[in-house]
Design a protein with these regions (language model features):
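Non-catalytic terminal and connector segments of soluble metabolic enzymes
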Residues: 1-292
Length: 292
């Protein structure tokens, strides 16, 4: 409700006085010389009424195919720089309530000095999430065996009045490993999509979406290493102070953000989420009818 008024309030008016209470008051610039505007940087553009917003969105949709997309070959780098691109996903829990968490996470990544060359809100379905996270399933299996072994030993300790033969606990852990892995993997998929994959009955439901993420493409020298250093360890408890996961994560699933671990992973992940697909005309036409 009142989305236009609320956005205008947060963005703020054009002003020569930087008060820091609005986006423009913090990040905008307004300079006059001899009574005339010499420089104006609004920081953010937002619509003032429904009619104007419709016109502006139709302009965006009209030119998004030619002027939008990933900003390749826009930024000039020294010839010796070996460029890398990497993908960051800010996870669904950051969008489940009104907060500045997303902006704070992006601020933290800005410490890398890398450029954002692409940004897109995405909605993962079960099929897409399963493909995206497939590589971690094997790694999960080995982790789960060790975790299961601890749980089995803890559960059996003191509950039996005889000593188990050597290797029995390891055998039980090996037998249960695949079930535990599937259980943990399904928790990740449910978190990213809002849908429990065990409850999906047909292929159509695998395309359904309920949650959203923000996908960001960063570019620069050693982009993958720089982003992952700021991101921190998977488990927030093990992450270094000042990292995204230490400061914004709750557990190994709700840990703030995902980042690609190699150039090949970045390419694969960007392909899966279709980061370069232009959705703007479709979305605008769905709400306002034909663009032209």
């Amino acid at each position: 409700d009142n989305v236009i008024e609320e956005l205008r309030r947060v963005v703020g008016h054009i002003t020569k006085i930087s008060m820091g209470e609005t986006i423009r008051g913090t990040y905008g610039d307004y300079i006059e010389k001899k009574g005339r505007i010499a420089y104006f940087e609004p920081a953010v553009l937002t619509g003032s009424d429904e009619e104007g917003i419709e016109q502006e969105l139709k302009i965006w949709a009209k030119y998004s195919k030619t002027d939008g997309g990933i900003l390749e070959k826009i930024i000039s780098y020294p010839p010796e720089v070996k460029l890398e691109k990497t993908l960051v996903l800010i996870k669904p829990d950051s969008f489940q309530e009104l907060s500045s968490k997303v902006g704070n996470i992006i601020d933290r990544f800005s410490q890398t000095g890398l450029f954002i060359i692409g940004a897109k809100v995405i909605h993962m379905g079960v099929r897409e999430a399963e493909e995206f996270y497939a590589p971690i399933k094997e790694r999960l299996a080995e982790k789960m065996k060790g975790k299961l072994l601890k749980e089995i030993r803890s559960s059996l300790q003191g509950s039996l009045d005889f000593k188990l033969p050597q290797g029995i606990e390891e055998g039980i852990a090996e037998e249960l490993k695949s079930y535990k892995t599937e259980h943990e993997f399904n928790k990740i998929i449910k978190f990213m999509t809002g849908i429990d994959p065990r409850e999906v009955l047909d292929e159509e439901e695998k395309e359904e979406v309920r949650e959203k993420c923000l996908a960001l493409v960063y570019q620069g020298e050693n982009a993958i290493m720089k982003i992952r250093k700021v991101l921190g360890e998977t488990n927030p408890e093990e992450a270094a102070p000042g990292t995204v996961r230490k400061d914004f994560g709750l557990d190994i699933i709700k840990n703030g953000a995902h980042a690609s671990d190699s150039s090949l992973s970045a390419e694969r992940e960007m392909r899966i989420i279709q980061i370069e697909k232009d959705d703007i005309p479709e979305i605008v036409e769905r709400h306002y009818g034909r663009i032209n």
